[in-house]
Amino acid sequence: MKPAVDEMFPEGAGPYVDLDEAGGSSGLLMDLAADEKAVHADFFNDFEDLFDDEDIQ
């Protein structure tokens, strides 16, 4: 027996919307672009050259 949606998410759907309700995928992308973006405070951009193949043997 599969749980019903209200059993899986008793707090409701939250910020998620159906693509049909968002006006299609373009409306959803505009909603995502309008949201505030944040980066984790402990994330350090400590990547060296990701495309450096000189060290591959």
UniProtKB/Swiss-Prot annotation:
A UniProt-annotated Pfam family: MYEOV2
Keywords: Cytoplasm, Nucleus, Signalosome
GO BP term, pick one: positive regulation of cell population proliferation
Location (main, coarse): nucleus
GO CC term (a single one): chromatin
Disulfide pattern: none
Compartmental location: Nucleus; Cytoplasm; Nucleus, Nucleoplasm
Family membership noted in the UniProt record: Belongs to the CSN9 family.
Function: Component of the COP9 signalosome complex (CSN), a complex involved in various cellular and developmental processes. The CSN complex is an essential regulator of the ubiquitin (Ubl) conjugation pathway by mediating the deneddylation of the cullin subunits of SCF-type E3 ligase complexes, leading to decrease the Ubl ligase activity. May play a role in cell proliferation.
Subunit structure, interactors included: Component of the CSN complex, probably composed of cops1, cops2, cops3, cops4, cops5, cops6, cops7, cops8 and cops9.
The protein, known as: COP9 signalosome complex subunit 9
Organism: Xenopus laevis (African clawed frog)
High-level lineage: Eukaryota, Metazoa, Chordata, Craniata, Vertebrata
Gene label: cops9
